Curated annotation (Swiss-Prot):
Keywords: Cytoplasm, Exonuclease, Hydrolase, Nuclease. GO terms for molecular function: exodeoxyribonuclease VII activity; nucleic acid binding. GO terms for biological process: DNA catabolic process. It comes from Lactobacillus acidophilus (strain ATCC 700396 / NCK56 / N2 / NCFM). Belongs to the XseA family. This is Exodeoxyribonuclease 7 large subunit. The keyword Nuclease applies. The gene is xseA. It is an enzyme of class 3 (hydrolase). The keyword Hydrolase applies. It is found in: Cytoplasm. It catalyses: Exonucleolytic cleavage in either 5'- to 3'- or 3'- to 5'-direction to yield nucleoside 5'-phosphates. Heterooligomer composed of large and small subunits. InterPro entries: Exonuc_VII_L, Exonuc_VII_lsu_C, OB-fold_nuc-bd_dom. Bidirectionally degrades single-stranded DNA into large acid-insoluble oligonucleotides, which are then degraded further into small acid-soluble oligonucleotides.
């Protein structure tokens, strides 16, 4: 029974976990510190530490919360973190579970702005080639700003003064606060849903601090400005203020009044320009008419108009010369053709087929006779050579040798005996004469050296 007073490790960790859960001060903790051991894990949960001068605590930030972080955390950066404290049972260690993280201080806002600007610049959102041209004579202008501020008043007064023809439509939105970015995006999407109804859009607000102007630096607002089909004029803050909306817009104006001036032409200036063009056009037309009248007078007073027949004298002379040249050319052509005809007849006579056929017949007979004579000579030569070869063969024939009284000897196997070294005593031999054979038996073998061997 004494063992019941001992807790298991799991039981103890569970008890401590419940203590943390039941402590209201640990349910929502606002913590500030410096990021330590931060290693960004792509598409995953983040594990790091927060520290100050004296201590540190382990932090876990699940992916669903980290994806909402609007800046790029880095090692050593000071941050504000919101979350709760709990125990990780398998290791028996308590840690901080972060649900939100923001950079600490105004310097952090500038750092966040800098990081987003670099990111969007790499994507090409600020490139000049993406800038759209502002139309010169807009029919309808959409304005995204606060409904109660001086911005819309300045824009409408300026636009109506300069170009009353243009219609101004306000799409009210919050321009400051936590929900301002969402409100700005919603207003721009309403404009985009109208298709090509609007020729240009103005987005802006009055001056303020960096925190006041921050909605115009939010990534979703900047991307929506970039995606608008019509040209966008940005007028956020004073001339010294520059937001990311100013950079991505097709044009930037220092004030709302300047934005309205950028979007609309000055009607009086345009009318003055039209009157000036009309005057120039009228003057040009008068000059052209005067020049044409002077030319007409010169033509009417010319000798050709007074005596029209002279107009054709030169042409008639030209026609006569051309006729003569044509006749001469035809006669020359005819003469050349006759000469060519005579030459062709001469060539045809020279190559008369009957004459060529007779020549070929005579040549064939001559060649046939030469072939017959050559064949006779050839056969005669071959017969003589054949007779000589037959005589030589007959002279070297063994039968001729036998006719002169010589014999040749073979053993009983029919092999020719040419030396006494091939026979032994009592061997049977055959002696061959020209008219028959004689069987013989060796009685004695006697070897004699001839004259060549003695030498």
């Amino acid at each position: 029974m004494a063992e019941n007073k001992y807790l298991t490790v799991t039981d103890l960790n569970y008890y401590i976990t419940q203590k943390f859960k039941n402590d209201p001060y640990l349910h929502k903790v606002f913590l500030q510190g410096e990021l330590s051991n931060f290693r960004y894990r792509r598409n995953s949960h983040q594990y790091f530490s927060l520290k100050d001068e004296k201590s540190k605590i382990n932090v876990v930030m699940f992916r669903s919360y980290f994806d909402k972080v609007k800046f790029k955390p880095e090692e050593g950066m000071k941050v504000y973190v919101t979350g709760y404290v709990s125990v990780y049972g398998p290791q028996g260690s308590y840690q901080f579970y972060a649900e939100n993280m923001e950079p600490a201080g105004l310097g952090a806002l500038y750092e966040q702005l800098k990081q987003l600007q670099v990111k969007l610049a790499k994507e090409g959102l600020f490139n000049p080639e993406h800038k759209k041209k502002i139309p010169r004579f807009p029919d309808r202008i959409a304005v995204v700003t606060s409904a109660s501020g001086a911005v819309i008043h300045d824009i409408m007064v300026t636009a109506n003064r300069r170009f009353p023809h243009a219609e101004i439509d306000l799409f009210p939105a919050q321009v400051q606060g936590d929900t301002a970015a969402e409100s700005l995006v919603r207003a721009m999407r309403q404009i985009a849903a109208e298709g090509d109804k609007y020729d240009v859009m103005i987005i802006g607000r009055g001056g303020g601090s960096l925190e006041d102007l921050w909605p115009f630096n939010e990534e979703e607002v900047v991307r929506q400005v970039y995606n608008m089909q019509m040209p966008v004029i940005s007028s956020v803050g004073h001339e010294t203020d520059t937001t990311l909306c100013d950079l991505v817009a097709d044009a930037r104006a220092a004030t709302p009044t300047a934005a309205a001036e950028y979007a609309t032409p000055n009607l009086m200036d345009e009318l003055a320009g039209i009157h000036q063009l009309q005057s120039r056009l009228f003057s040009s037309m008068q000059t052209i008419i005067r020049q044409k009248r002077d030319r007409l007078n010169r033509i009417q007073n010319s000798i050709i108009m007074r005596e029209p027949t002279r107009l054709y004298d030169q042409q008639i002379e030209t026609v006569d010369r051309l006729k003569q040249r044509l006749q001469n050319s035809m006669q020359n052509k005819l003469d050349h053709s006759k000469q060519d005809y005579r030459l062709l007849n001469q060539r045809l006579f020279a190559v008369n087929p009957d004459k060529q056929i007779n020549q070929m017949k005579q040549q064939r007979l001559f060649l046939a006779k030469r072939l017959s004579d050559n064949m006779q000579h050839y056969l005669k030569d071959k017969r003589n050579i054949f007779a000589q070869i037959v005589q030589q063969l007959d002279d070297y024939s063994p039968l001729k040798t036998l006719e002169r009284g010589f014999v040749y000897t073979t053993d009983r196997d029919g092999k020719t005996i040419s030396s006494v070294k091939q026979v032994n005593k009592n061997d049977s031999l055959n002696l061959h004469f020209k008219d028959g054979q004689v069987a013989a038996k060796v009685v004695e073998v006697k070897e004699e050296k001839n004259a060549n061997e003695e030498k």
